[in-house]
């Protein structure tokens, strides 16, 4: 067995909690957990703890929830824990240079892409949107840049034609802990081999916006189908009908050319709602009107056929 490391864990969402759970059964010593402050959630806007906090408190671990790690007293809390390494997974706060240098082995991060491709906030969604054939996780040594540190370990997985951001998230939440445990063993043994990122291969995964998820019919059917999968389950691709936002959960590409203007409804039947795009035809299969549950197109046509008259154009 490798040396047992003193670890500070910093993370916030469920993705991070799955990594903490793996660490708890790895034989290492978790000396402290940092997570974001409780946030208002749900209809009642009640303050809710992060998934990482819930798990940490359940396991009796000391939890710290600073708003920032810039104040000296918060940095001192990190120093007082005398960690060998700090593991950061979707924490959501910037780590100042002083904090990065505190642990003996520095700070390492689990990132949801095969760096240097897709540095930034939304790597899972951007890899789908771009039509990448594969993605994965990279365990990297953190520095002051945005996902610019040396790479310590990578694990890859294929992106299938059915994958959404939700399914890919689950796949990477399985891969990440595997890569993390292996990397910690290598750090403890002194066998880690840091690899500098090739700056010529860098792409950036910009944060998502709801407006970006609005369907632009001038794009190709293939691009729109990828967009629908990339933005599922958040923020969800959508279009506007009679002033109402209607979410699109699933669609397929019909490999046929059409001279109709982008956004023109070509057919509306139980096989789908076929719409002309900038290149090809998009077949809408599952949609969700405002205030309703997601439903098949057949059910939607039973209640709202007037929305989808062939020849009409969708906004």
Swiss-Prot record:
Has keyword Transferase? yes
Which residue stretches belong to region N-terminal domain?
Answer: 2-189
The family database entries (PROSITE patterns) matched by this protein are listed as: GART
Listed InterPro entries? Fmt, Formyl_trans_C, Formyl_trans_C_sf, Formyl_transf_N, Formyl_transf_N_sf, Formyl_transferase-like_C_sf, GART_AS, Met-tRNA-FMT_C
Q: Which residues bind (6S)-5,6,7,8-tetrahydrofolate?
A: 113-116
Q: Which GO terms describe its molecular function?
A: methionyl-tRNA formyltransferase activity
Cite the entry's keywords alphabetically: Protein biosynthesis, Transferase
What reaction is this protein's catalytic activity?
A: L-methionyl-tRNA(fMet) + (6R)-10-formyltetrahydrofolate = N-formyl-L-methionyl-tRNA(fMet) + (6S)-5,6,7,8-tetrahydrofolate + H(+)
Q: Which GO terms describe its cellular component?
A: cytosol
Region annotation (C-terminal domain) maps to 210-315
Which Pfam families does the record associate with it?
Answer: Formyl_trans_C, Formyl_trans_N
User: Which E.C. number(s) belong to this protein?
Assistant: 2.1.2.9
Protein family per UniProt: Belongs to the Fmt family.
Q: State the function annotated in the UniProt record.
A: Attaches a formyl group to the free amino group of methionyl-tRNA(fMet). The formyl group appears to play a dual role in the initiator identity of N-formylmethionyl-tRNA by promoting its recognition by IF2 and preventing the misappropriation of this tRNA by the elongation apparatus.
Free-text comment on this protein's domains from its UniProt entry: Composed of an N- and a C-terminal domain. The N-terminal domain carries the tetrahydrofolate (THF)-binding site and the C-terminal domain is presumably involved in positioning the Met-tRNA substrate for the formylation reaction.
Q: What is this protein called?
A: Methionyl-tRNA formyltransferase
Give me the gene this protein comes from.
fmt
């Amino acid at each position: 067995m490798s040396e047992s490391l003193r670890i500070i864990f910093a993370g916030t969402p469920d993705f991070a909690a799955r990594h903490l759970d793996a660490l708890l059964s790895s034989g290492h010593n978790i000396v402290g957990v940092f997570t974001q402050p409780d946030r208002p959630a749900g209809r009642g806007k009640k303050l809710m703890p992060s998934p990482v906090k819930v798990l940490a408190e359940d396991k009796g671990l000391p939890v710290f929830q600073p708003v920032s790690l810039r104040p000296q007293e918060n940095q001192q809390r990190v120093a007082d824990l005398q960690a060998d390494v700090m593991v950061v997974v979707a924490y959501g706060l910037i780590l100042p240079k002083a904090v990065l240098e505190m642990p003996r082995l520095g700070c390492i991060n689990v990132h949801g892409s095969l760096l240097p491709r897709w540095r930034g906030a939304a790597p899972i969604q951007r890899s789908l949107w771009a039509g990448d054939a594969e993605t994965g996780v990279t365990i990297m040594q953190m520095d002051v840049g945005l996902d610019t540190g040396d790479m310590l370990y990578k694990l890859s997985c294929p992106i299938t034609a059915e994958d959404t951001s939700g399914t890919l998230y689950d796949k990477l939440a399985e891969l990440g802990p595997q890569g993390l445990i292996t990397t910690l063993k290598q750090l403890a043994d002194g066998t880690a081999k840091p690899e500098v990122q090739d700056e010529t291969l860098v792409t950036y995964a910009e944060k998502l916006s709801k407006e970006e998820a609005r369907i632009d019919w001038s794009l190709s059917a293939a691009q729109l189908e990828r967009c629908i999968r990339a933005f599922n389950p958040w923020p969800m691709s959508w279009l506007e009908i009679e002033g109402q936002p209607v979410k699109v959960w699933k669609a397929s590409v019909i490999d046929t050319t059409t001279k109709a203007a982008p956004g023109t409804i070509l057919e509306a039947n139980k096989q789908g709602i076929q719409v002309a795009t900038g290149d090809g035809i998009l077949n809408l299969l599952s949609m969700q009107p405002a205030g309703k549950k997601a439903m098949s197109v057949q059910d939607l046509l039973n209640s709202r056929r007037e929305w989808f008259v062939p020849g009409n154009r969708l906004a």
